[in-house]
Swiss-Prot record:
The lineage of its organism: Eukaryota, Metazoa, Chordata, Craniata, Vertebrata. This is Cytotoxin najalgesin. Monomer. Keywords: Cardiotoxin, Cytolysis, Disulfide bond, Membrane, Secreted, Target cell membrane, Target membrane, Toxin. GO terms for cellular component: extracellular region; membrane; other organism cell membrane. One of its GO terms (biological process) is killing of cells of another organism.
């Protein structure tokens, strides 16, 4: 599954790239 940086709940479901998904989410939220 690809992490959707537009959905804050979705990055939590990313098992391998949790930190990466979180960073992408934060960057898109800047």
């Amino acid at each position: 599954l690809k992490c959707n940086k537009l959905v804050p709940l979705f990055y939590k479901t990313c098992p391998a790239g949790k930190n990466l998904c979180y960073k992408m989410f934060m960057v898109s939220n800047k």
